[in-house]
């Protein structure tokens, strides 16, 4: 790219969509969720998962991941720890497993 030339604004619509979606999620988190009380079976909560998924994967894939997570959040599912999958440029997060511990005797 030559000096003085601007990059095309192809990412702007996705950034605006991400900001809008995260803004709506924040309204839910701070305005509605406290009135309903804790209901999510997972950690992080479904709304926080959605925010993180949008931040890591963008608005389209992030919304898809959030929708899949919300569908799993029901009384028949045990819940538990369910982190957002790593993005294309992230190293996978290591969840707490007992593989590191020596075998018990």
From Swiss-Prot:
UniProt topology in membrane: Peripheral membrane protein
Cellular component aspect of the GO annotation: plasma membrane
Primary location: membrane
Compartmental location: Cell inner membrane
Keywords, ordered alphabetically: Cell inner membrane, Cell membrane, Membrane
Composition bias type Basic and acidic residues, residue spans: 90-105
Stored PANTHER family: MEMBRANE PROTEIN INSERTION EFFICIENCY FACTOR-RELATED (PTHR33383:SF1)
Function: Could be involved in insertion of integral membrane proteins into the membrane.
The name this protein goes by in its record: Putative membrane protein insertion efficiency factor
């Amino acid at each position: 790219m030559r000096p003085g030339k601007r990059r095309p604004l192809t990412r702007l619509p996705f950034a605006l969509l991400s900001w809008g979606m995260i803004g709506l999620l924040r309204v839910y988190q701070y305005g509605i969720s406290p009135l309903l009380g804790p209901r999510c079976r997972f950690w992080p909560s479904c709304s926080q998962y959605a925010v993180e998924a949008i931040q890591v994967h963008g608005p389209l894939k992030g919304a898809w991941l959030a929708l899949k997570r919300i569908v799993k959040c029901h009384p028949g599912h045990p819940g538990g720890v369910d982190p957002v999958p790593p993005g294309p440029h992230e190293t996978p997060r290591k969840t707490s497993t007992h593989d590191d511990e020596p075998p018990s005797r």
